[in-house]
């Protein structure tokens, strides 16, 4: 069969490879000049920067794409586990190194507060149990009809997840120490979630880091996008770049998706899998006579969106890779207040920031004697933060100054401005324009209880035959391992439909 995949982000690349490995003819359409989507790369002034995700968690999910296509993952990506997850800075003289080794972890916890290990381990145990339930009964399955969700098994297993509790509540149930609470709560921002609103399951990330380890891909995270692109080429997939989709064509008589309009041409296909950002697809790519019924264009703005980010890609003329960790977090003096600012639409003047220094793990990512630095500052998305004008150069200059002051918390970056030889910024406006991410949301729809599982945009269209969706705004959600799972379960449903002649 002829299959079209819209979008060459990590979801589209993984899905296309899985489909092609089943013997089908697959074409990927990507509007940008390169593959990767939000897993993007910037090469500038001799530096190589990952532009989006940077932390490799759940490596088996990465490997699975290659092995399920009959390939050896080691021929495409080179993974290695990190001994230390990150350095955390509460202020300049208060730094904690978070290890993966259990004995070192206990020592770290006890140094923060004697006796805190028990609560921390109880937290990890509780979250691991919830993760196993969620993975088996909710995350790795699709919901094609109401009975797939509304059944006794889902009711019983869902009750065990205690989804009415929020991430903050679960953390505070086990952890009394404010520093350790911050360590756990901050990580919900990795997928754009407000810990006060996100279901307690989304405090899962610290557990995943501890249980499965944190890894690094040679060449940076973009090495995964390159590996997937090569996998697709090896499987005979055709990747068309600079190919902007104008419309998904729906046959009104048979209510099926049978073509796409791309760069002015109508291209016929047997099935279409769309991995572009779902809200933008529902708003802009469906014909007027054939909207997605649950998500018509006029309702898209009313959905809840994850936060956005202001990113900086900085090159400096000194090599500091032996003085800083690969991954670093610098906390705001008022962490809770900063969270409120992000999700109430206000700009922070004392943000918590994430700092990634890829040459610590791979010297090839910066010129000899120099260092590339990636900085992420969580911000409101464009709807909640409608009062922030990201096109205002005076404003972005002010934010850069805020970030440079915050970077000075790390001693080696105290005089960073005098060493800058390259600087690039990426704003919420850029997320919206570059990736068609609605409201510049960095992680798609926020996974609130009302936008999770059965209530999230589904992988198989309920309105039109031969139309499928995958990606961060669809089930099961955002984050690289999760969108890879989205690709897997969606392709499984498509292959099942093909085998059954649906």
Curated annotation (Swiss-Prot):
The keyword Membrane does not apply. InterPro entries: Amino_oxidase, Carotenoid/retinoid_OxRdtase, FAD/NAD-bd_sf. Its EC number is 1.3.8.-. GO terms for biological process: carotenoid biosynthetic process. Pathway: Carotenoid biosynthesis; staphyloxanthin biosynthesis; staphyloxanthin from farnesyl diphosphate: step 2/5. One of its GO terms (molecular function) is 4,4'-diapophytoene desaturase (4,4'-diaponeurosporene-forming). Keywords: Carotenoid biosynthesis, FAD, Flavoprotein, Oxidoreductase, Virulence. Pfam families: Amino_oxidase (PF01593). FAD binds at residues 5-17. Belongs to the carotenoid/retinoid oxidoreductase family. CrtN subfamily. NCBIfam families: crtI_fam (TIGR02734). Involved in the biosynthesis of the yellow-orange carotenoid staphyloxanthin, which plays a role in the virulence via its protective function against oxidative stress. Catalyzes three successive dehydrogenation reactions that lead to the introduction of three double bonds into 4,4'-diapophytoene (dehydrosqualene), with 4,4'-diapophytofluene and 4,4'-diapo-zeta-carotene as intermediates, and 4,4'-diaponeurosporene (the major deep-yellow pigment in staphylococci strains) as the end product. This is 4,4'-diapophytoene desaturase (4,4'-diaponeurosporene-forming). It comes from Staphylococcus aureus (strain bovine RF122 / ET3-1).
């Amino acid at each position: 069969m002829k299959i079209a995949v819209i979008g060459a982000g990590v979801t589209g690349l993984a899905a296309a490879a899985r489909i092609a490995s089943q013997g089908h003819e697959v074409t990927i359409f990507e509007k940008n000049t390169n593959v990767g989507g939000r897993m993007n790369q910037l090469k500038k002034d001799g530096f190589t920067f990952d532009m989006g995700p940077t932390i490799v968690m759940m490596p088996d999910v990465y490997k699975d794409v290659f092995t399920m296509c009959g390939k050896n993952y080691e021929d495409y990506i080179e993974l290695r586990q990190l001994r230390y997850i990150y350095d955390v800075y509460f202020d300049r003289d208060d730094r904690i190194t978070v290890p993966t080794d259990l004995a070192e972890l206990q020592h770290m916890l006890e140094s923060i507060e004697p006796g805190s290990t028990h609560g921390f381990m109880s937290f990890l145990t509780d979250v691991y149990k919830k993760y196993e339930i969620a993975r088996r009964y909710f995350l790795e399955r699709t919901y094609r009809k109401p009975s797939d969700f509304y059944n006794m098994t889902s009711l019983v297993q869902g009750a065990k997840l205690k989804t009415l509790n929020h991430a903050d509540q679960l953390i505070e149930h086990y952890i009394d120490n404010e520093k350790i609470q911050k360590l756990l709560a901050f990580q919900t921002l990795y997928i754009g979630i407000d810990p006060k609103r996100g279901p307690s399951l989304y405090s899962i990330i610290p557990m995943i880091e501890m249980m499965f380890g944190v890894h690094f891909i040679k060449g940076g995270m973009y090495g995964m996008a390159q590996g997937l692109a090569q996998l697709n080429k090896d499987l005979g997939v055709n990747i068309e770049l600079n190919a902007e989709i104008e419309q998904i064509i729906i046959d009104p008589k048979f209510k099926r998706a049978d073509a796409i309009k791309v760069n002015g041409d109508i291209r016929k296909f047997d099935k279409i899998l769309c991995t572009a950002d779902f809200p933008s697809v529902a708003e802009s790519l469906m014909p007027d006579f054939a909207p997605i019924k649950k998500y018509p264009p006029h309702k898209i703005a009313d959905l809840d969106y994850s936060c956005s980010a202001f990113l900086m890609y900085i090159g400096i003329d000194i090599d500091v890779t032996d003085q800083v960790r690969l991954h670093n977090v610098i906390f705001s003096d008022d962490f809770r207040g900063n969270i409120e600012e992000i999700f109430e639409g206000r700009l922070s003047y004392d943000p918590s920031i994430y700092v990634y220094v890829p040459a610590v793990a791979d010297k090839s990512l910066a010129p000899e004697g120099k260092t590339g630095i990636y900085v992420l500052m969580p911000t409101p998305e464009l709807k909640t933060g409608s009062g922030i004008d990201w096109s205002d150069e005076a404003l972005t200059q002010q934010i850069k100054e805020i970030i440079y002051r915050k970077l000075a918390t790390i001693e080696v970056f105290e005089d960073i401005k005098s060493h800058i030889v390259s600087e690039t910024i990426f704003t919420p406006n850029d997320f919206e324009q570059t990736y068609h991410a609605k409201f510049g949301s960095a992680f798609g729809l926020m996974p609130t209880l009302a936008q999770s599982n059965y209530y999230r945009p589904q992988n198989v269209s309920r309105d039109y035959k031969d139309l499928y969706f995958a990606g961060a705004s669809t089930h099961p959600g955002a984050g690289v391992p999760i969108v890879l799972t989205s690709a897997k379960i969606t392709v499984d449903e498509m292959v099942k439909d093909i085998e059954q002649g649906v």
